[in-house]
Amino acid sequence: KKNIHSAYAEATYQFTPRWIVNLGMKYDKVDIEVDYNVNRGGSKGNNTIQKDYFLPSLNLKYNLNDKNSLRLGASKTYTLPQAKEISPYRYVGVNFNSQGNPNLKPSDHYNLDLKWDFNPTPTELISLTAFYKLIKNPISRIEVASAGGYLSYENIADKATVAGVEVEIRKNLFVRPVSNAAHGMNKLSLGLNGSYIY
């Protein structure tokens, strides 16, 4: 059983023609219950996750000129374990076997990103983003030392960090008006996206 009830509020304000700020707050009430009955060991039980999440977000935009802008974003998010990750079933897969961990905890994420956007035209884009993420109780799949050899899931540390850069390009190869103006334009666009994460 998985129930998540959410509420969200946001406000946007333009201080000047160049500065825009957006504030948001999301509330999630999480209620997860997993019942299990492991035949091999005769183990029956259930596992529950009941949490209240308050998830703020902040986005600032500064327009350098008509074609260039800077954006700064900060937010909090989370990751919940899947049902198979928190129940002690043994899963037999094609490439590996795995078993859940009833003691697994959700992960909290604190996100920060800085983005530069350049719009040569209203429908074209070149952007560069630098991002950083702090993860509390990160979840990872690990190998368990045993005769059978299987994988399980653990909160592998108190915290972990992820950082990187991302480049996005969206370019119109051609734009041609159609004979009937009501149908807009025929166009062919090329999109490229690449990331470096460390």
Enumerate the language-model features and the residues they cover.
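Extracellular loop and loop/strand-boundary signature of outer-membrane beta-barrel proteins
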Residues: 1, 39-47, 97-102, 150-157
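Residues that define the transmembrane beta-barrel architecture of outer-membrane proteins
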Residues: 3-5, 50-54, 108-112, 159-165, ...
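Gram-negative outer-membrane beta-barrel transporters
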Residues: 130-134, 151-198
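Surface-exposed extracellular loop regions of Gram-negative outer-membrane beta-barrel proteins
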Residues: 31-36, 66-111, 130-152
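Transmembrane beta-barrel strands of outer-membrane/channel proteins
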Residues: 7, 23-29, 70-76, 116, ...
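Signature of Gram-negative outer-membrane beta-barrel scaffolds
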Residues: 1-65
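Residues on the lipid-exposed face of transmembrane beta-strands in outer-membrane beta-barrel proteins
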Residues: 7-13, 58-62, 114-118, 130, ...
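Repeated loop/turn-to-beta-strand initiation elements of outer-membrane beta-barrel proteins
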Residues: 18-21, 67-70, 122-126, 175-179, ...
